[in-house]
């Protein structure tokens, strides 16, 4: 019997891994939201994963199936409570998530990240720097005010690169 599992993938490889798994005829579920992004010369709707770094796969809990998934480009590991034993996700949770996305409601993916919140940079060239969240540009991009060397610098950062202090 097939079960749903959470597949952890490389940063910003959610859609790559999803497409590769679909080529292998593995049933996947990549919850994503659309957001209108604006560049200097154009606007475009862009899809962003609801859970950055993760997607769901529906496979048999047999070693061959697990190895096939893990050999997919961008895949890192299946989440597990015990090493070597991936933890299944109940079908009801997947169904609820699908219903929530199909409802068309606006979802706040990072409710803990509000304007004025103190944040710390988790990765990238500014790793370890602390600042204040000034503005939310869209679901995933925030303007952070960081004080470095006596100066205040505004930096746009992806939400998965920062955390609330």
Whereabouts are the PLM-identified features?
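Ferredoxin-like alpha/beta domains used as RNA- or RNAP-binding modules
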Residues: 1-165
């Amino acid at each position: 019997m097939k079960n749903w599992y959470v597949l952890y993938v490389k940063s910003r490889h959610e859609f790559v891994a999803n497409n590769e798994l679909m080529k292998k005829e593995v049933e996947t579920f990549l919850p994503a939201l659309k957001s209108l992004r604006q560049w200097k010369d154009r606007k475009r709707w862009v899809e962003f994963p609801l859970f950055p770094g993760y997607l769901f796969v529906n496979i048999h809990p047999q070693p061959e199936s697990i190895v096939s998934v893990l050999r997919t480009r961008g895949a890192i590991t299946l989440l597990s409570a015990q090493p070597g034993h991936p933890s299944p996700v109940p079908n009801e949770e997947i169904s609820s998530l699908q219903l929530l996305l199909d409802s068309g409601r606006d979802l706040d993916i990072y409710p803990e990240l509000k304007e004025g919140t103190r944040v710390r940079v988790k990765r990238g060239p500014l790793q370890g720097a602390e600042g204040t969240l000034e503005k939310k540009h869209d679901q995933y991009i925030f303007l952070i005010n960081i004080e470095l060397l006596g100066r205040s610098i505004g930096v746009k950062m992806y939400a998965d690169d920062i955390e609330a202090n």
